[in-house]
A protein has these predicted regions:
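Phosphate-ester processing/binding pockets and catalytic centers
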Residues: 1-232
Length: 232
């Protein structure tokens, strides 16, 4: 009489949820360069830790957590950030800001290129700067999710409706058709959704992402980083 020992079912590892917040450079501020960047963070870290810390930072330095952090306005001490004209207050804010960012378990991916070189190389065949960079971010985000056993969501700042529609089209084409690196089934298993949030909705993730592209361009150009944001 034979003996059969039933094997224990193999438990699948639970996937971790990640959010990638995406923002781009202001074309008038970076000259020939275009940069699209994404900040990747665990959903649990974002919702349970980071949001509260940034809101407390805003309340401490600007008196309200409803203020939307904006890199260009802060750099030029405009509107809600005129208080940063005071060197002491400015230094204290950025020191506190950097101290929040340093311990974060985040990953940053960026795609940048010289617009003029792109046009010179591809001429009339060149597609939009945003579309080229977005496809690169998609590939790298899926690679990250695959390596970290994650599910991913992308959140972007809403632009014109037709521009949002173009990005949605690129996103779903990528999901359905796959790429040279990943089959469609792998992409769909990892990449779950794309969302758009309007600028004044006070999304903490997008406010942090707003600092990244300009910082990347500063690194490329070798510009000074007085508050060591590049090192965080």
């Amino acid at each position: 009489m034979g003996y059969y020992k039933q094997k224990k079912p193999i438990k699948k590892k639970t996937k971790t949820e990640y959010i990638m917040f995406v923002d781009e450079t202001d074309p008038t501020a970076t000259g020939d360069y275009f940069c699209l960047s994404g900040i990747i963070i665990k959903r649990s870290d974002y919702e349970n830790d980071l949001v509260d810390k940034i809101n407390n930072l805003k309340k401490t330095h600007f008196g309200s957590c409803d203020i939307v952090l904006h890199y260009t306005e802060m750099k030029n001490n405009r509107n809600n950030f005129k208080i940063l004209k005071d060197a002491v207050k400015r230094n204290k804010f950025y020191m506190d800001f950097v101290n929040i960012l340093k311990p974060l378990d985040i990953t940053i991916i960026s795609s940048y290129f010289n617009r003029n070189n792109m046009k010179a190389t591809y001429g009339k065949c060149a597609v939009s700067d945003y579309d080229v960079a977005f496809k690169t971010l998609l590939e790298n985000f899926v690679h990250f999710l695959k390596n970290n056993n994650g599910d991913g969501m992308i959140i972007m700042e809403s632009r014109l409706f037709n521009e949002n529609a173009n990005l949605q089209n690129t996103f779903y084409q990528y999901l359905n058709n796959g790429s040279e690196l990943f089959q469609s089934s792998i992409i769909k298993y990892r990449l779950k959704c794309l969302g758009f949030i309007v600028k004044n909705d006070n999304c903490i993730g997008l406010q942090l992402a707003d600092f990244v592209p300009a910082t990347i361009i500063r690194i490329i150009k070798g510009a000074q980083d007085k508050f060591s944001i590049q090192k965080t």
